[in-house]
Design a protein with these regions (language model features):
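Hydrophobic alpha-helical segments, especially N-terminal targeting/anchoring helices
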Residues: 65, 161-162, 289, 296-297, ...
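Glycine-rich loop(s) and the adjacent beta-strand/alpha-helix scaffold that form part
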Residues: 35, 78-148, 327, 333-336
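Rossmann-like flavin
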Residues: 1-16, 218-237, 242-243
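A glycine-rich dinucleotide-binding beta-alpha-beta segment and adjacent secondary-structure elements
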Residues: 236-320
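Glycine-rich phosphate/pyrophosphate-binding beta-alpha loops
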Residues: 147-154, 173-179, 278-284, 311-327
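Internal hydrophobic alpha-helix adjacent to the cofactor/substrate pocket in enzyme cavities
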Residues: 128-137, 233, 238-241, 248, ...
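Conserved redox-cofactor binding core of oxidoreductases
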Residues: 1-82, 102-104, 248-267
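An anion/pyrophosphate-binding glycine-rich loop and adjacent beta-alpha core
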Residues: 124, 128-130, 137-236
Length: 343
């Protein structure tokens, strides 16, 4: 599968796109609390336990224990009580990002401050703070990704316009790119304009994001009427739709480059979905590590006995995100962290 907009403009005009993303084939897939993370961790933990590894549950690490300059264990909370655990060879931090730590977000990634975090509340930045307390260095703490909460099956069949009634991004690109463009460049103002036939087609299409489908916020027989209902500048949406339809009649989108398979004239009845504020950010920066997942001190030297992986580190996607990168990053460097700690 395509995972980061590589098959959309402008990237598909620069390099021939290739689907390099992978969807794990899992039986009885779930969403929610027993969704992605749970389904990935369950077989890993079960396999480890069969090999004799002891698993502890309902623990929340508070700090690490240091003997001299070496990390030798952790102190955690379980049901309000402290639990100390000795680590003979090392401690691996894999506790998520800081997307739910408002103060850390305000200080390091203010562009997403005040917007819903597209992650779970356990992403509180504690692992980063634990590392920093030992003098650990960090990198790309301002790096973020922005999710956009709308079903792509609807977006590709309509046009996304900003608060001035203008299109600003190809609707068939990676939703993360749409999220960043909407929040950072359009003041979080976005509307999906779509006609009745395209809306019904999108609602009936197979989708991995059906929970993100939305009902129209406004409906009208003409674009002029819809424009007025939406409170857009007079004539702005009309000119946008007219230009889009002129080229769509020939199956092209020379303005933004949406692929021809999704380009069709928008004809009445018309609808618009209010997508203002439908963005949620998460953080990509974190602890600086080596290729062996050793946490680096600000001096540049590894902190003995301390390793880290996943979103609490500044991984491969700090400069930009693609779907699944956190899983790839976390699993690859998590394995390297385990190997390094076991030496």
């Amino acid at each position: 599968m395509y995972s980061g907009g590589e098959n959309a403009a402008p990237f598909n005009t620069l390099v021939d796109p290739a689907p390099r993303g992978h969807v794990p084939q899992m039986s009885e897939k779930n969403t929610g609390e027993k969704g992605g993370g749970y389904m990935l961790m369950k077989p890993l933990v079960e396999t480890a336990e069969k090999l004799g590894v002891r698993a502890e549950y309902d623990l929340r690490v508070q700090t690490v224990v240091v003997d001299g300059d070496r990390v030798v264990g952790v102190v955690a909370k379980r049901y309000g009580k402290d639990v100390a655990i000795r680590a003979r060879k090392g401690v691996v931090l894999a506790m998520g990002s800081f997307a739910y730590n408002n103060e850390m977000v305000r200080s390091n990634a203010p562009r997403i401050f005040g917007h819903p975090a597209a992650s779970i509340e356990a992403h509180d930045g504690r692992a980063i703070q634990i590392g920093q307390a030992l003098g650990a260095d960090t990198a790309h703490m301002d790096a973020t990704e922005v999710a956009f909460f709308c079903d792509p099956q609807l977006m590709v069949r309509g046009i996304l316009v900003n608060g001035r009634g203008q299109r600003y991004i190809p609707e068939d690109t990676y939703p993360g790119r749409i999220g960043q463009a909407t929040l950072f460049q359009q003041d979080n103002q976005a509307f999906l304009v779509i006609d009745e036939a395209a809306y019904e087609e999108g609602m009936n299409a197979e989708s991995s994001s059906a929970q993100l489908r939305a009902q129209p916020s406004w409906v009208a027989e003409t674009v002029e009427e819809l424009e007025g209902e939406m409170g857009l500048p007079a004539g702005s949406l009309q000119s946008t739709v007219d230009l889009y339809n002129r080229h769509a009649a020939e199956g092209s989108d020379p303005v933004l480059g949406k692929k021809s398979e999704w380009v069709k004239p928008i004809v009445g009845p018309f609808a618009a979905i209010d997508l203002r504020g439908r963005t949620g950010g998460f953080t990509l920066g974190g602890l600086k590590t080596t290729v062996d997942s050793e946490v680096l001190h600000v001096s540049g030297a590894p902190i003995p006995g301390l390793f880290a992986a996943g979103r609490c580190t500044s991984g491969v996607c700090a400069g930009g995100y693609a779907s699944g990168t956190s899983l790839g990053d976390g699993s690859f460097f998590g394995r390297r962290a385990g190997i390094s700690a076991a030496r």
